[in-house]
């Protein structure tokens, strides 16, 4: 009686993680892509349409925090153990880091305004800490399981040619603890820090190749590029473009998390209402 539910659980995992399993004649062929599959997957992300500046009737840039503790955001967090997962399925953090290491993502920045680039060595300083302890050394690394969220920068704009409100993701940054505090129980630092920033259009090719588990149809995985462009995540607005130097909500509403959330909802609602207001005479 207990074998059937277990079989139903294992089957989707096998179907997703082991390509060509139905056509394989020997074990070595399991997981290898067929020529037809390679040809079908040899595509790129859907190109953005050209937007004329004169067609943008209104726009606003916002910074949002995506909390990976929320269930809807879990596809960006998992998998954290890749020993039994196909090579094209990685967490968003591992995908970005692999793209940086291999040179697919050439430009990495220290902030969301792209004012200064950082090198691979500077990224390692934020991800790896070697602590000397007498004759021994302990190495601490920020891994996928240490990433607690993402900061995303995007623009909402009203396209007067199409007559609708649209969103374009501009940049994103993984958020984690300070690597210097890892392994130090005496230091309580719950602050999350931006590890690095990437310009989203430059990451689309590699995010398109990396797949996300699709619980509704395991034979048709979704790419990170599709997921992000569709805004399949829950977020809280942290900052908006404003006259006060783009200050954060926490800078003018201090010490009250509830009021900060209410202010974030107010900003989100004002953006949503902008499309309706455009059609009012």
Where do the language-model regions lie?
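Bacterial Sec-dependent N-terminal signal peptides
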Residues: 1-25
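Residues that line or immediately flank small-molecule/substrate-binding pockets and catalytic motifs
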Residues: 8, 154, 176
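A domain-level signal for the mature, folded cores of soluble proteins
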Residues: 18-160, 179, 200-281
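Extracytoplasmic
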Residues: 145-147, 167-169, 193-195
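Short consensus segments that form the blades of beta-propeller domains
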Residues: 161-163, 185-188
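Extended serine/threonine-enriched, polar tracts that run as long, contiguous segments within proteins
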Residues: 164, 169-182
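Short secondary-structure subsegments characteristic of cysteine-rich extracellular domains
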Residues: 188-206
């Amino acid at each position: 009686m207990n074998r059937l539910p277990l079989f139903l659980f294992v089957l989707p995992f096998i179907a997703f993680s082991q390509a060509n399993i139905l056509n394989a004649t020997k074990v070595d062929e399991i997981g290898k892509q067929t020529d037809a599959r390679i040809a079908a997957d040899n595509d790129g992300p859907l190109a953005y349409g050209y937007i004329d500046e004169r067609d943008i009737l209104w726009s606003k840039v916002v910074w949002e925090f995506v909390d990976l503790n929320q269930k809807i955001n879990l596809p960006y967090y998992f998998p954290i153990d890749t020993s039994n997962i196909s090579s094209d399925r990685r967490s968003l953090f591992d995908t970005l880091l692999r793209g940086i290491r291999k040179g697919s993502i050439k430009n990495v920045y220290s902030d969301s305004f792209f004012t200064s680039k950082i090198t691979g060595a500077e990224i390692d300083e934020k991800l790896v800490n070697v602590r000397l302890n007498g004759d021994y050394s302990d190495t601490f690394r920020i891994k996928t399981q240490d990433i607690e969220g993402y900061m995303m920068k995007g623009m909402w704009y009203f396209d007067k040619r199409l007559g609708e409100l649209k969103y374009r993701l501009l940049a994103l940054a993984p958020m984690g603890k300070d690597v210097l505090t890892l392994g130090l129980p005496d230091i309580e630092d719950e602050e999350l820090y931006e590890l690095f920033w990437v310009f989203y259009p430059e990451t689309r090719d590699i995010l398109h190749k990396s797949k996300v588990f699709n619980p509704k149809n395991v034979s048709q995985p979704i790419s990170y590029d599709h997921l992000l462009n569709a805004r399949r995540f829950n977020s809280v607005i942290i900052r908006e473009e404003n006259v006060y130097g783009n200050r954060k909500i926490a800078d003018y509403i201090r010490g009250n998390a509830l009021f900060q959330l209410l202010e974030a909802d107010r900003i989100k609602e004002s953006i949503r209402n902008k499309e309706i207001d455009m059609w009012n005479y």
